[in-house]
């Protein structure tokens, strides 16, 4: 080999090795551990539904226990409307904390909307295994309630003010502390 070839060959081999490594890394997509619609962390988004601009959200459904879930009956209190599904791990992880919030705060009510294709009797059985203190109603994934935007990911949580208007929307898992901060900020802004 000539001196110039002896310098070029190692450089060529090193570049080739780097290209092979880079190609391998791009080909290795991480396997999803949860469905793609589950968001990793909560973000807030401004409400952009007609209900937010037109006044109180109107929604009346039958809860899984057979009672009527009517958002109008919650006027005067802050309402957390949580879209969730049985297959959504972040949704299930936040349910006990939302249940505790519902029981602890008299000025905050929580309602759950199961955005799931599960059969209604299977949903009732699921809730017996994962009980919560707040009412749950099932909503159709094909025809979600017009009062809210179709969830782009789960969980999606709306905070309604005491007049029933959308105050805030959270995309992804939410904590009671985040809800309470939003309630406190909303209450302070109105006083």
Model-derived segments and spans:
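Sec-dependent bacterial lipoprotein signal peptides
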Residues: 1-22
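Alpha/beta-hydrolase fold active-site loops
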Residues: 78-79, 108, 155
